[in-house]
């Protein structure tokens, strides 16, 4: 997605050869117009897949997931990383390690919001080692729901997350695929479209 790549080039900050900071438009301050375009793009890519729910993880996955849900006309469920007094019944849980925060979290979704009748699109802001995606896959499977695919806003293709998910048979659609963050510069994977 060219608009997203331009935004990354203009506003993204390479903190190391492993970490890209995009807090000016995605995971702290949010650019609503860009999120709308991201939602439109995911909706276009999954329009014929019979999606009934979108599942994401708080907090940075929520904006692109909501915009996609708006376009597809389906509800969005987000996994919580923190305990809540209201989230107690029929919990679907998974452990997720955050590459950026270097911490492990227990994520949870109320089972009342997912069922074996759902066909789910998983959306997240980043894909690095795939831990968040694997956690969300686990939660969706616990509900007995099926998975249409995984939509990623920014993929770090030099890390193993995508390959692992594809090997497991999941369709992964990433809007910006980063090949490298070496020498303080963002290099994108050159995609060949037929």
Swiss-Prot record:
One Gene Ontology cellular component annotation held by this UniProt entry: cytoplasm
Top class in the EC scheme: transferase
Matching InterPro entries: PRibTrfase_dom, PRTase-like, Pur/Pyrimidine_PRTase, Xanthine_PRibTrfase
EC number(s) from the headed UniProt entry: 2.4.2.22
Catalytic activity: XMP + diphosphate = xanthine + 5-phospho-alpha-D-ribose 1-diphosphate
A single GO BP: XMP salvage
Pathway it works in: Purine metabolism; XMP biosynthesis via salvage pathway; XMP from xanthine: step 1/1
Lineage: superkingdom: Bacteria
Cell compartment(s), UniProt: Cytoplasm
GO molecular function: xanthine phosphoribosyltransferase activity
Binding-site positions, xanthine: 20, 27, 156
Entry binding sites for 5-phospho-alpha-D-ribose 1-diphosphate: 128-132
pH dependency: Optimum pH is 6-9.
Induction description: Repressed during growth on purines as a nitrogen source.
Keywords of the record: Cytoplasm, Glycosyltransferase, Purine salvage, Transferase
Chief location category: cytoplasm
UniProt record similarity statement: Belongs to the purine/pyrimidine phosphoribosyltransferase family. Xpt subfamily.
Job of this protein: Converts the preformed base xanthine, a product of nucleic acid breakdown, to xanthosine 5'-monophosphate (XMP), so that it can be reused for RNA or DNA synthesis.
Extra remark: Highly specific for xanthine, with a strong discrimination against hypoxanthine and guanine as substrates.
UniProt subunit comment: Homodimer.
Name the record gives this protein: Xanthine phosphoribosyltransferase
Species annotation: Bacillus subtilis (strain 168)
Organism lineage string: Bacteria, Bacillati, Bacillota, Bacilli, Bacillales
């Amino acid at each position: 997605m060219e608009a997203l790549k331009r935004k990354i080039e203009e506003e993204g900050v390479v903190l190391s050869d492993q970490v890209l900071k995009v807090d000016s438009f995605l995971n702290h301050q949010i650019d609503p117009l860009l999120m709308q375009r991201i939602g439109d793009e995911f909706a276009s890519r999954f329009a014929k897949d019979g999606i009934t729910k979108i599942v994401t993880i708080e907090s940075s996955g929520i904006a692109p997931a909501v915009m996609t849900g708006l376009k597809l006309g389906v509800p969005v469920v987000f996994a919580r990383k923190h305990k809540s007094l209201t989230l107690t019944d029929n919990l679907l849980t998974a452990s997720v390690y955050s590459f950026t925060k270097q911490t492990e979290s227990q994520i949870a979704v109320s089972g009342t919001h997912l069922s074996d009748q759902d066909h789910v699109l998983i959306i997240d802001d980043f894909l690095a080692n795939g831990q968040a995606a694997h956690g969300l896959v686990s939660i969706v499977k616990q509900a007995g729901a099926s998975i249409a695919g995984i939509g990623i806003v920014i993929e770090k293709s030099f890390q193993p997350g995508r390959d692992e998910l594809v090997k497991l048979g999941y369709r992964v659609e990433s809007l910006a695929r980063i090949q490298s963050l070496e020498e303080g510069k963002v290099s994108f994977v050159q995609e060949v479209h037929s």
